[in-house]
Amino acid sequence: MAVPTASPRPIGQASTFPDSGIKTVAEIKDHSFAFSDPASTSGHLFPAYGLRKAGLDPDKDIRAVYAGSHTASFEALYNHKVDAGELNSAQLESATQRGHYKDGDMVFLWKSEPIPTDPFSVRGDLPEAFKKKLIDVLQHLDLSTLDQADLKIMGGTGITQLVPQSDDAYNGIRDLVKTLNIDLEKLS
């Protein structure tokens, strides 16, 4: 059964500044690269996946810097403290709204598919009528009436609506897990 999740979905990106000399993801080899946090999907896992898909080993072929947050990663890249780095779409939108970014400030070398956010899940053994009603309520929730703290709990302040999500939406995550050789048993 499809359950609501946040929309729009963020995009992970590998980025650099225009005069870095780096024109492709493969050219990031032996350069510094800012990730936000090792536990971040858009700020670490998806950019590492993009590097791996380009033939780079994110553990050996780059000089990884963990900035600590998406904002810190953006600032390290923007201020040329690193040669390249992750810049997710939500951070880019936030920086644009604050006047800290304009088109042309960065070069985007790779972009992920939209990253599924955490879904609202419903126990499978609940009555179908209840599940359908809950999904309907969530899909028609007027997010503009929620304060920023409530929106953050729901996955971020940039969401505009809750939309149906299917299991197929997580195939990119499954491919990422396989490509990066992540042992899910060790994470539980």
For each predicted feature, which ranges?
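Pocket-lining segment of extracytoplasmic ligand-binding domains
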Residues: 20, 31-129, 136
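An extracytoplasmic/periplasmic, membrane-proximal ligand-sensing/linker region
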Residues: 122, 126-188
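Short, charged, surface-exposed loops that flank catalytic or proteolytic processing sites
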Residues: 23-24, 133
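Well-ordered alpha/beta subsegment
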Residues: 27-29
